[in-house]
Amino acid sequence: MSKVKIELFTSPMCPHCPAAKRVVEEVANEMPDAVEVEYINVMENPQKAMEYGIMAVPTIVINGDVEFIGAPTKEALVEAIKKRL
């Protein structure tokens, strides 16, 4: 089974980013064989954010598609991952 790639775009001053990171980490821990996670700080890697047209954080990109702007619920993230498996 190929893994679903999750890219979580955050910034150090973002008040909602820790919640998004917690959700992503929780799902990744529950689905380790299905998910590959990359955390991207937009302050350190603005070019990557520009490639996706990201203007706000947290943003979650799944397999190259912007899926969530803001922190999703765990259920919503799991559903989005399962659609791609």
From Swiss-Prot:
Q: Which Gene3D superfamilies match?
A: Glutaredoxin
| Keywords assigned by UniProt, alphabetized | Cytoplasm, Disulfide bond, Electron transport, Redox-active center, Transport
Q: What is its main location?
A: cytoplasm
Q: List the disulfide bonds.
A: C14-C17
- SUPFAM superfamilies according to UniProt: Thioredoxin-like
The answer to whether the entry has keyword Transport is yes
UniProt cross-references to NCBIfam families, sorted A to Z: redox_disulf_1 (TIGR00411)
State what protein this is by name: Thioredoxin
Q: Which organism is it from?
A: Methanocaldococcus jannaschii (strain ATCC 43067 / DSM 2661 / JAL-1 / JCM 10045 / NBRC 100440)
